[in-house]
């Protein structure tokens, strides 16, 4: 076990005194790291995620290289879907492709439930390896939110408009709610197993829920999010982070959920979130594109985010979306160092 562990992010969420604003980056594991690219010359994404030693190495790299205050498990949000009967393939340059999309309630009924120890032991073994032997910062486990998972399962892959997903919601509520309930059950079991293996925080990625308006979110999504988070927290008192893209119109709905941290994309400032009445710890929210700019521009954009975060009092620095593959690793290291130095107290 690790002594003198850096629990800054957990202290921030609890409202305890910290020495600096904690920082981590979505998609910090992999992508922009040269060590990861070298691995990808030999191993596929599937190979890496199914070999705990390799996966733990990739997960741990950004903590060593960038000195982040948390690690996030290197996995894909599709991980729990294949064991329940979803024929999913990750295609380079496209993303998840589903070969048996959900169209009817019979398709939902064919889905099985997940047994994490039986179906995804490599996920749990990776977490145990990290938490028992190596990691000196909290590990973030994660899952895709029911809407985002369902959108892939219904559309058959990435979508711009989510027409099939919305069509099912509006014209076949029985199938929609059956799918939501099934995915909540899967997510609760998957997340609970991650926590029991050693994950100390959970992030729920609702990447595409911004496609819905407030009324539809309340009717078709919110009750299921409440059940998912509540059932996880009934089992374990674990902090939960919720993040989505282009969902500023849903901020007040999210603030009602039993989450601990609300992740902002780059379109909504910390001050704006406060003015909207958000009471949760805030996470974010540098535009990831800024990391491709010269350092003086990056620093200029970092300061107001950090100033607003310090004024708010409960802030975790992150990007407003994931790290782009083109971002230089040294830039991420400098950002992490700047956040720690600028917010030191």
Swiss-Prot record:
EC nos: 4.1.1.37
An annotated GO BP: protoporphyrinogen IX biosynthetic process
Keywords: Cytoplasm, Decarboxylase, Lyase, Porphyrin biosynthesis
SUPFAM superfamilies per UniProt: UROD/MetE-like
PROSITE patterns linked: UROD_1, UROD_2
Domain of life: Bacteria
UniProt cross-references to InterPro entries, sorted A to Z: UROD/MetE-like_sf (IPR038071), Uroporphyrinogen_deCO2ase_HemE (IPR006361), Uroporphyrinogen_deCOase (IPR000257)
GO cellular component, one term: cytosol
Top-rank EC class of the record's enzyme: lyase
Entries under Pfam families matching the protein: URO-D
Protein location: Cytoplasm
Entry keyword Lyase: yes
Signal peptide start and end residues: none
NCBIfam families (alphabetical): hemE
Function: Catalyzes the decarboxylation of four acetate groups of uroporphyrinogen-III to yield coproporphyrinogen-III.
Subunit structure: Homodimer.
Record-given protein name: Uroporphyrinogen decarboxylase
Source taxonomy: Bacteria, Bacillati, Bacillota, Bacilli, Bacillales
